[in-house]
Amino acid sequence: MANHKNLFFLCFLIGLGLCSARRALLSSSESEAEVAAYGVNSGLSAGLGVGIGGGPGGGSGYGGGSGEGGGAGGHGEGHIGGGGGGGHGGGAGGGGGGGPGGGYGGGSGEGGGAGYGGGEAGGHGGGGGGGAGGGGGGGGGAHGGGYGGGQGAGAGGGYGGGGAGGHGGGGGGGNGGGGGGGSGEGGAHGGGYGAGGGAGEGYGGGAGAGGHGGGGGGGGGSGGGGGGGGGYAAASGYGHGGGAGGGEGSGGYVP
């Protein structure tokens, strides 16, 4: 009988030891899995934050790195949009937002990206891409399109209508300049001034009360002048056609 009791107690101890060992192994494997998952998630989050520059949504961060092929800026509701990438081949600018709208995008350097992004009322539009082949600006609220156009052989073209009391699109500059900006609806200043050393044309014409007319094309080529601004102020509704350096543009008041 004593032998049976000892054998039962021995089996009980062996079973208890096996259960304890199994529990320890399971808990250790679970903790390792949790640590591994935490490490992967942390690595992904850190990678996104660094790669995008402000994380998904852009926030108030100025996205896009400088240098060769800078990244694009993010979007952000109610925030300042992401900034453009600098360096050679800079990325595009940020998106729209609340108060200050689209970011001042456009990469500087050769092949600068376009600056997109319209803002709400009171927001600034997208910035233009600088450098050779710079891109155009975007639309906006109080201040409309960005001042596009590159300083090289790029066709600029800063398009975008402004909001109430807003400025119109910016002019395309550079050699072989691009077209001017669009009209600002009810804007104080209408179309931009398209200019450049090539055959850039200045489109525009600000509609609304007190709107200034379209900008003139010009440069060394045959840039056509912009149209006049409609609305209620004929005195300021002129398009200044022609440009410096022998441009053949023409502009006038268009009711």
Swiss-Prot record:
Residue ranges of coiled coil: none
GO CC terms: extracellular region
Tissues showing expression: Expressed in emerging leaf primordia and young leaves.
Protein name (database record): Glycine-rich protein DOT1
Chief location bin: secreted
Disruption phenotype: Defects in venation pattern in leaves and cotyledons, post-genital organ fusions in all aerial organs from organ primordia to young expanding organs and glaucous and rough leaf surface.
Known function: Involved in leaf vasculature patterning.
